[in-house]
UniProtKB/Swiss-Prot annotation:
Record has Transmembrane as a keyword: no
Protein name, per record: Probable glycine dehydrogenase (decarboxylating) subunit 1
Enzyme class name: oxidoreductase
Encoding gene, per UniProt annotation: gcvPA
Signal sequence bounds: none
Keywords carried by this UniProt record: Oxidoreductase
Length: 447
């Protein structure tokens, strides 16, 4: 009987091995160390394949081992819990948007293209930047792309990254710039304020510096107060400025465009996206109006034009700068984007509105400051004096590992451990005063 060519069988295997001159299939793995090769059958604890119902039962048993938290997590580090309106979830789940399709054919993609265009427009208004792309993977890859973009423009071989930026983002940037031979110079943090040390910045040799990155607020949740000075310092030396921002904080503080920032990046997680093992995330990428910046900008851009009949039409524009051209000429090889997530963020911002954004930012500010006050009442202080938003660091007299374990026993997820005695906490609109009070009380009981 003729076997289907897609189904593996001994006859076809032997023919393929003979064709490539190999006697045994294991010879194909000769470069793999022998101690890494599994030479026994898989230890599957069932004597027969399970039915769908049996698998469902088994998965439910495993699920019961998970720790069900009493409250939303208080762990900081850039990804914090926020309330997502049901309308956002509903619109994102519609089949018109819930697709992996890339809208290369504008004539059949007007609805999807318009949704992306609306996201770009909303984000441009929020950031006060003229051009926003259709999104990136996440904040970390957006920073990496910004650094590579700056290098393409001025051909310099060094980038300034502050020590108070998200350390996980720094690792991603380090990976991406390695192949280009771009050096990373660290900007020290002032030990008192938690902000970039301006005096140390002025001492750095900037002759070969391509770009400087600022995170606002920084990894410790602290607002950088010297951004105007840093931007002026950079422009005098023809250094490209990159700012990473928390979208919700823009309800209270100046947007990047108002500072004259060249490239703005961030993450859309806090504006309408759920937390799920580090994803799904959505990188924000924007530039000010400058033809060189726009031409070197990575990612897709949706533009508005007219068709041959004079009707409004949406289409992908400036495609020669992206991966539609030869690989070595493309502005980005990280590629793709997070269109569905971008649409979710657009819906979220539309529902929130300008006043709603400010109200939400104020609520987060008030709740996080209430939490810090409760910590201070019990003698727990932050090592930094700078003004903060949503997140802050607390130093404890005992090893934080003991505190965190005790909290987990009470089904409370505490802060992100930074060292033996410090942890980074976050407080948002989903954390009530009752929750905050119990967190602080539970920590005090351990100490």
């Amino acid at each position: 009987m003729e076997m289907h060519p897609w189904l593996p069988n001994l006859k076809y295997t032997e023919e393929m091995l003979k064709e490539i001159g190999v006697n045994d299939i294991m010879n194909l793995f000769s470069d793999v160390p022998q101690d890494l090769i599994l030479k026994r059958k898989l230890n599957i604890p069932y004597d027969k394949p399970l039915s769908e119902y049996e698998i469902s039962q088994r998965l439910n048993e495993l699920k019961k081992k998970n720790l069900e938290l009493k409250y939303p997590p208080f762990i900081g580090g850039g990804l914090c819990p926020h309330y997502i309106p049901e309308a956002v979830k509903f619109i994102m789940s519609r089949s018109e948007f819930y697709t992996a399709y890339t809208p290369y054919q504008p004539e059949i993609s007007q609805g999807l293209l318009q949704a992306i265009y609306e996201y770009q427009s909303l984000m441009a208004e929020l950031l006060e930047m003229e051009f926003v792309n259709a999104s990136m993977y996440d904040w970390a890859s957006a920073i990496a792309e910004a650094v590579l973009m700056a290098h393409r423009i001025n051909r310099r071989k060094s980038v300034l990254l502050p020590s108070n930026m998200n350390p996980y983002h720094r690792e991603v940037v380090k990976t991406w710039v390695y192949g280009k031979g771009i050096r990373i110079t660290e900007l020290p943090t002032d030990s008192t304020s938690g902000q970039i040390d301006i005096e140390k910045l002025e001492q750095i040799n900037t002759d070969d510096v391509s770009a400087i990155y600022i995170q606002q607020p920084n990894f410790y949740g602290i607002f950088e107060e010297n951004i105007e000075y840093i931007v002026d310092f950079a422009k005098k030396k023809n250094i490209i400025t990159i700012m990473g921002v928390s979208p919700l904080s823009l309800g209270l503080i100046k947007p990047p465009g108002e500072y004259g920032i060249d490239i703005a990046v961030g993450d859309g997680q806090e504006i309408g996206l759920p937390l799920n093992y580090g994803g799904p995330l959505m990188g924000i990428f924007a530039v000010r109006w400058d033809s060189q910046l726009v031409r070197q900008m990575p990612g897709r851009i949706v533009g508005l034009t007219k068709d041959e009949k004079g009707n409004r039409a949406f289409t992908l524009i400036l495609q020669t700068r992206e991966q539609f051209t030869r690989r070595e000429k493309a502005t980005s090889n990280i590629t793709t984007n997070e269109t569905l997530m971008a649409i979710g963020s657009a819906v979220y911002l539309s529902l929130l509105g300008k006043h709603g954004l400010r109200d939400l930012a104020e609520e987060i500010y008030v709740r996080s400051h209430y939490a810090k006050k409760k910590f201070e009442e019990l003698g727990f202080k932050s090592p930094y004096s700078g003004e903060f938003f949503e997140e802050f660091v607390i130093q404890f007299p005992k090893n934080y590992n003991l505190i965190h374990s005790s909290l987990l026993n009470k089904r409370i997820h505490g802060g992100l451990q930074l060292n033996d005695y410090c942890a980074l906490f976050c407080f948002t609109e989903v954390h009530t005063r009752v929750m905050i009070d119990e967190l602080v009380k539970s920590i005090a009981e351990v100490l």
